[in-house]
Design a protein with these regions (language model features):
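Helix-hairpin-helix
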Residues: 124-144
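An N-terminal alpha-helical hairpin/helix-loop-helix interaction module that forms a charged
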Residues: 1-130, 148-231
């Protein structure tokens, strides 16, 4: 039986709420995406330069903490990923269609394979190499920050997009692209508004990311009472 999913509508108010963080604070951590995405626009930038931008963006977006193995590595581990991303530079575009799915999944697969092969060590067990905790969150954040072809699939996005527990695959990508196409008019309004406020172009998938992250964040906050307990 074919799965049915709720119709997801993007509204400008949530995007505006996300945007207000950067309007209020020009050094807000959300701005790290702009600098990373902008750096990857120029293929002539040195690999070392791009890897450093990618590392700081990931750190700013919470990927250098907790159980993430990249916490124990320096920025140069991303140089191999930069070379992979260069091959898919044609995916940097304003809008995505079902025709782009194969190439996006190829990029996802190559990045995941690359990071899965990286080992790291912890001080308390310096003789046994560990595998990086390569998650959909890490890989999609890399894709969003460099190519802009998918939103970052963290917990807040998945909650708002109704795909909790779902791994990134072709089916989920189709849903995301379909959502962006169904909300094209609103997304274009948001893009113009963002350009006016930040003087920077945001591709469609970044707008999708902003909306569903903010909605997931607000939904989570609404579940918390004043004493910090979940209703």
């Amino acid at each position: 039986m074919e799965m049915t999913y709720p119709i997801l509508t993007i509204d400008k108010s949530s995007v505006d709420k996300y945007l207000c963080n950067m309007v209020q604070d020009s050094n807000h951590r959300f701005k790290s995406w702009e600098y990373c995405y902008g750096a990857f626009n120029n293929l002539d930038n040195p690999t070392d330069h791009l890897a450093l931008h990618l590392a700081f963006y990931l750190a700013s977006w919470g990927m250098y903490r907790g159980s993430c193995g990249i916490l124990w590595k320096d920025y140069t581990i991303h140089m191999g990923a930069v070379n992979i991303i260069r091959k898919f530079h044609s995916l940097r575009k304003e809008w995505f269609t079902m025709d782009d799915i194969s190439q996006i999944m190829d990029l996802y697969g190559e990045l995941k394979k690359y990071y899965n092969e990286i080992k790291y060590y912890k001080p308390e067990n310096s003789t046994s190499p560990l595998n990086l905790a390569v998650t959909d969150t890490l890989i999609t954040k890399i894709m969003l920050g460099t190519i802009g072809c998918v939103p970052a699939l963290d917990g807040l996005f998945k909650q708002a997009f109704h795909c909790q527990g779902k791994q990134f695959d072709e089916e989920l990508l189709k849903r995301i692209i379909d959502c962006s196409q169904s909300n094209k008019d609103t997304i274009q309004q948001c893009q113009r508004y963002i350009s006016e406020k930040l003087h920077c172009f945001y591709p469609s998938m970044k707008v999708v990311d902003m909306y569903f992250w903010q909605k997931g964040f607000d939904d989570l906050q609404n579940k918390v009472t004043k004493n910090g307990k979940i209703r």
